[in-house]
Structure formats: C-alpha cells, structure tokens
C-alpha cells in the first residue's frame, strides 16, 4: 500500500503543488499514517476468493471480454495499471517480446483529465523513451461522447431500472471531481462530464431526469 501511495501521490499531474514542500509532507506525514488506514479500507472490499482488488478483477475481465469479442489471433489485448502492478512499462516490454509493432493505448477514463488520461500518456512515453524498439503508437485520449459508449451507458441504466419495482425521482450521474484550480487552468474534464450526462439524457429511454454530481478528491487544492 505504501509503495502504491508513494507512486500515485508523487505524480506531478495528480498533485500540482511545490514538489519540494509536497515531498516533505508526503514522506513525513501521509506515508507514515495513510497506509494503515488505506489497508483497512481495502480489506473491506478485497475479493478474497480471487485474491485481488475489484479494480484488478474487473479490469482483467474487461480485457478478456474484449479479446474474445475481437477474436483475432494477430491482435493482442492486454491491460496495465497506471500505478502498481502490472505496470505499463512491464506490459509494453511483454508486447515487444510478442513481436507487436502497432500499439493502441486506451486509457479507461472516458472523460479526459490531466490527472488521469494525461498521466497514462506520460508513462507510456517514458517507457518507450527508454527502449530502442519503437512501435507505431496511437493513444485514444477520450470517448465521453462516442455513440457506442453512450449507448452502453444508457442500456446499463435502463436494465437496472427495469429490475426495480419503483420509479426513481432522479438519476444522478456521479463523477470524480478535480480541484477547481485545475479547471481554471484549462482542464476540460468538467465539461466532458456534463457532455456525457447531456448525451445520456438525450438518448436514454426514460422520462426520469438526470443530473450531474461530482465527488471531490481528497486534495490539498481547492
């Protein structure tokens, strides 16, 4: 847990404060007290029968199902974690060893933000910069308004509503938040979230109103 938190909270895309001051705070305080609290929280959601976190399990299942759907022996589908294991660097090395020459990177964040999608791009570039082998590279930066994505979200909501015997007053589309100063600097994430909600409202087969809400990151930034 401590190693994961150190990697995550040392990312300059995630924490945009003076790095010297932040490293003191991080190493003296946060990494001293936070790991034990985080471990307790993880213990509550840990999938003991799979011996993995829900994030790892569902990401692995997404990768497997996409592989089955593509069903092409010449296309390798794999996954990596931005922080922790399996790392982006290790997976790129594995793909190189398999003889891959064309690399498509799909960050699993529909709405682009510098603290999520951009840091994945950073790590991909860093990994490739240390290698002599260079594949052709395509990164899918965001897909908040892709028709297939909107259709899938609408179907998921419709299926859930059909299984309950009462009608909700409202549907809340909840997203992670980002510090306001990131938005003020030009991060488009907030706009993409509202765009996704609008498109869901326009395409979903229900008269229930939909609103956008944001969950704030635990962050020293306003």
Question: Predicted segment positions?
Answer:
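N-terminal glycine-rich anion-binding loop in soluble enzyme alpha/beta folds
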Residues: 1-76
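Short, structured patches in soluble enzyme cores that scaffold and shape functional sites
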Residues: 107-109, 139-142, 157, 173-177, ...
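Short helix-capping segments at alpha-helix termini
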Residues: 70-73, 128-134, 165, 203-207
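Redox- and metal-dependent alpha/beta enzyme cores, enriched for Fe-S-associated oxidoreductases
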Residues: 180-212
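Hydrophobic alpha-helical segments within soluble ligand-binding/sensing domains
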Residues: 147-169
């Amino acid at each position: 847990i401590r190693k994961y938190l150190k990697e995550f909270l040392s990312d300059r895309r995630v924490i945009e404060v003076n790095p010297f001051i932040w490293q003191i705070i991080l190493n003296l305080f946060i990494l001293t007290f936070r790991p034990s609290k985080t471990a307790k929280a993880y213990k509550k959601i840990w999938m003991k029968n799979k011996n993995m976190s829900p994030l790892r399990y569902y990401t692995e299942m997404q990768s497997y199902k996409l592989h089955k759907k593509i069903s092409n022996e010449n296309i390798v589908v794999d996954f990596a974690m931005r922080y922790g294991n399996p790392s982006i660097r290790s997976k790129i090395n594995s793909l190189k060893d398999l003889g891959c020459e064309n690399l498509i990177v799909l960050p699993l964040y529909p709405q682009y933000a510098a603290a999520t999608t951009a840091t994945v791009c950073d790590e991909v570039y860093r990994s490739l910069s240390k290698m002599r082998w260079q594949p052709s590279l395509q990164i899918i930066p965001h897909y908040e308004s892709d028709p297939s994505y909107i259709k899938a979200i609408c179907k998921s909501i419709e299926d859930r509503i059909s299984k309950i015997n009462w009608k909700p007053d409202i549907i809340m589309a909840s997203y992670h938040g980002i510090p306001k100063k990131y938005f003020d600097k030009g991060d488009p994430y907030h706009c993409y979230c509202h765009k996704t909600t609008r498109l869901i409202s326009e395409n979903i087969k229900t008269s229930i109103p939909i609103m956008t809400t944001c969950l704030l990151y635990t962050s020293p930034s306003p």
